[in-house]
């Protein structure tokens, strides 16, 4: 049976084995998928040993940049993202690295939530790997404005500059953000600590702005609570992004695109009762 896994450290919390088991059952694909706790000091060796038999893998924190350096070839979106979250074993044992995070977020927004980016004003919060991974897909949708804001303005400006060839994007510090926006995506990890980036309330237009937090939890995240209190039209969390990036990886491995909606529903139900 073909073997797949997710590499991470820590990894016990991962929902990927459940997601891919549900995808496999739904599509009739015979495969085994497990979580692998990779050592912090030898990810490359650990991954290579898995791929002596393994066919593919997902990669989560803190190994996405190491996976980028490990592979023999990269997809264009992985090259742009500077990180790899999906590994595919090719004929002859070569490894190809891809990044499905941006595609997953975009699909969750446009297909699941019905949010369009074309000609919209979009604010991305943060300048780390999570935001880097979604910039190219977002710019491909041709928003009217794409602003990257970060606590350290220089990081946001530099990141925006790397993607300027793909469309109109600029960077600034949180204090320099002037709204309102049609869509605000929080790509910082502030919600994990119960915090919210320091933004002016004018970034949200009451009854119009959609707010999306890449984080998710049983209850609304700190960012989504903040947004709802200020009249955001809708608040969305990152559980759909998790399922959609997994569906894209499954498609890369098996050539079959699973239906994500029933899997997302199962996870949402499990999260609410867990």
UniProtKB/Swiss-Prot annotation:
Residues engaged in binding NADP(+): 76, 126-130, 150-155, 214, 238
EC top class, as a word: oxidoreductase
Positions annotated as active site in the UniProt record: 64 (proton acceptor)
GO cellular component: cytosol
GO biological process: amino acid biosynthetic process; aromatic amino acid family biosynthetic process; chorismate biosynthetic process; shikimate metabolic process
Source organism (scientific name): Pseudomonas paraeruginosa (strain DSM 24068 / PA7)
Molecular function GO terms recorded: NADP binding; shikimate 3-dehydrogenase (NADP+) activity
Pathway: Metabolic intermediate biosynthesis; chorismate biosynthesis; chorismate from D-erythrose 4-phosphate and phosphoenolpyruvate: step 4/7
Protein name according to UniProt: Shikimate dehydrogenase (NADP(+))
Record field: catalytic activity: shikimate + NADP(+) = 3-dehydroshikimate + NADPH + H(+)
E.C. no: 1.1.1.25
Pfam families in UniProt: SDH_C, Shikimate_DH, Shikimate_dh_N
């Amino acid at each position: 049976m073909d073997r797949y896994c997710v590499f991470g450290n820590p990894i016990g919390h991962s929902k990927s084995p459940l997601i891919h088991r549900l995808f496999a059952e739904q599509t009739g694909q015979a495969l085994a998928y497990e979580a692998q706790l990779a050592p912090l000091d030898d990810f490359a060796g650990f991954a290579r040993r898995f791929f002596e038999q393994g066919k593919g893998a997902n990669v989560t924190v803190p190994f996405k940049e190491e996976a980028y350096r490990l592979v023999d070839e990269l997809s264009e979106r992985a090259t742009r993202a500077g990180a790899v979250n999906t590994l595919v074993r090719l004929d002859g044992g070569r490894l190809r690295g891809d990044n499905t995070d941006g595609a997953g977020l975009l699909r969750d927004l446009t297909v699941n939530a019905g949010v369009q980016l074309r000609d919209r004003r979009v604010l991305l919060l943060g300048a780390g790997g999570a935001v880097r991974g979604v910039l190219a897909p977002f710019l491909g949708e041709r928003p009217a404005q794409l602003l990257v804001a970060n606590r350290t303005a220089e990081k946001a400006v530099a990141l925006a500059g790397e993607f300027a060839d793909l469309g109109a994007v600029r960077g600034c510090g949180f204090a320099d953000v002037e709204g309102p926006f049609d869509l605000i995506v929080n790509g910082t990890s502030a919600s994990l600590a119960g915090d919210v980036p320091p933004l002016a309330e004018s970034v949200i237009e009451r009854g119009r702005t959609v707010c999306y937090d890449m984080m998710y939890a049983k209850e609304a995240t700190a960012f989504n609570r903040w947004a709802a209190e200020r009249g955001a039209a809708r608040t969305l969390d990152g559980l759909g992004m998790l399922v959609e990036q997994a569906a894209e990886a499954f498609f890369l491995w098996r050539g079959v695109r699973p239906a994500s909606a029933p899997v997302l529903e199962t996870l949402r139900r499990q999260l609410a009762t867990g």
